[in-house]
C-alpha cells in the first residue's frame, strides 16, 4: 500500500487526489441524469457543471478549515502544510458546512430553490465520500484502533485504559492477546496509522465507512430518489443516514478529537440526526 499510483521525479499521482477528481466527474454525471432534479427545473448542463465545481471547491475549503481547527496544535507549528490538501486532512462535517454555504449563494444567484439543489447533491456527495475513503486508506489515515482488543472494550470507550495495561506487559505476554481478533490491517510506519500503532493490525475504519457510504448511496439513488418526496426530504434522509454511519464508524476510529470525554463526531453526528428528523417533520407539514 502506498499513497500514490506512480511517481515521476518530484511528481506523484496521489490516490487521494485522484479519488476527488473521480468524485467530481461522477457528481456531474449523476446530476445530469437526476430525473427528479430535471422535473424540478434543473435542466441546464452547463449550470450543473458550474454548480458541481463551485460546491466541491467550497466543500474542500470548508473541510480543510474544519480539520485545521481541530488539529491546530499541530498546524500552528506547521503553517506551510495547511494548503497541502493532497496529503490528506479533510473533515467531512466541515465539507458539508462549506457545501451548504456554496449552495445558498448559488441558489440566490441563479434563482433556484435551495432544497432542490441540496436534494440533487446528496447522492453524488455520499458517493464522493465513499471514493474519498479509498484515498484515506492509501494514505494510511482515518485508521481504527488495534484489533487485538475485545469488541466490548472498543465500543465501551475503555480502550485507552486497556491499551496502557497491555503496554505494561512483557512482549511474551502481549503476544498472547494478538490472536483474540481474527483480522486487521497493518499500515506502513510512514503513515499516521503506522506511526501511532506500528506493527499492529488495526480496524480499517476508513473501509468500514467506504462500504456503509456506498450502501447509503444505493439507497438514496435507487430507492429514496424515486419516491419523489417533498423538497428537502432527501437532504434530511442524508443527514440521518450519514449521522448514523459516522457514529458507528467512530466507535472504531483512533483519531477522533475528544471534547469533555466525548468524541467530537458523536456530538456533530447526533446533531445531524436530530436536524434530519426535525426537518422531515417540518417539511411534511408544509405545502409545496
Model-identified regions with their sequence ranges:
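A feature for loop-to-transmembrane-helix boundaries and adjacent hydrophobic helices
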Residues: 1-288
Amino acid at each position: 500500500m502506498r499513497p500514490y499510483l506512480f511517481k515521476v521525479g518530484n511528481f506523484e499521482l496521489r490516490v487521494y487526489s485522484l479519488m476527488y477528481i473521480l468524485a467530481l466527474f461522477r457528481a456531474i454525471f449523476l446530476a445530469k441524469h437526476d430525473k427528479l432534479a430535471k422535473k424540478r427545473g434543473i435542466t441546464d448542463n452547463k449550470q450543473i457543471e458550474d454548480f458541481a465545481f463551485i460546491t466541491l471547491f467550497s466543500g474542500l475549503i470548508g473541510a480543510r478549515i474544519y480539520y485545521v481547527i481541530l488539529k491546530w496544535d499541530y498546524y500552528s507549528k506547521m503553517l506551510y502544510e495547511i494548503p497541502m490538501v493532497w496529503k490528506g486532512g479533510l473533515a467531512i462535517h466541515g465539507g458539508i458546512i462549506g457545501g451548504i454555504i456554496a449552495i445558498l449563494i448559488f441558489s440566490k444567484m441563479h434563482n433556484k430553490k435551495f432544497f432542490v439543489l441540496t436534494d440533487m447533491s446528496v447522492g453524488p456527495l455520499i458517493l464522493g465520500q465513499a471514493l474519498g475513503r479509498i484515498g484515506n486508506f492509501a494514505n494510511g489515515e482515518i485508521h481504527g484502533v488495534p484489533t487485538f482488543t475485545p469488541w466490548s472494550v472498543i465500543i465501551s470507550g475503555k480502550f485507552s485504559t486497556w491499551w496502557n495495561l497491555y503496554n505494561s506487559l512483557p512482549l511474551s505476554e502481549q503476544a498472547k492477546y494478538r490472536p483474540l481478533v481474527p483480522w486487521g490491517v497493518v499500515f506502513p510506519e510512514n503513515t499516521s496509522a503506522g506511526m501511532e500503532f506500528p506493527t499492529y493490525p488495526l480496524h480499517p475504519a476508513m473501509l468500514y465507512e467506504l462500504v456503509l457510504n456506498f450502501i447509503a448511496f444505493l439507497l438514496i439513488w435507487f430507492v429514496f430518489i424515486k419516491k419523489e418526496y417533498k423538497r428537502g426530504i432527501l437532504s434530511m434522509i442524508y443527514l440521518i443516514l450519514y449521522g448514523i454511519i459516522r457514529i458507528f464508524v467512530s466507535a472504531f476510529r483512533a483519531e477522533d478529537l475528544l471534547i469533555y470525554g466525548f468524541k467530537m463526531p458523536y456530538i456533530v453526528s447526533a446533531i445531524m440526526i436530530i436536524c434530519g428528523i426535525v426537518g422531515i417533520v417540518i417539511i411534511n407539514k408544509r405545502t409545496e
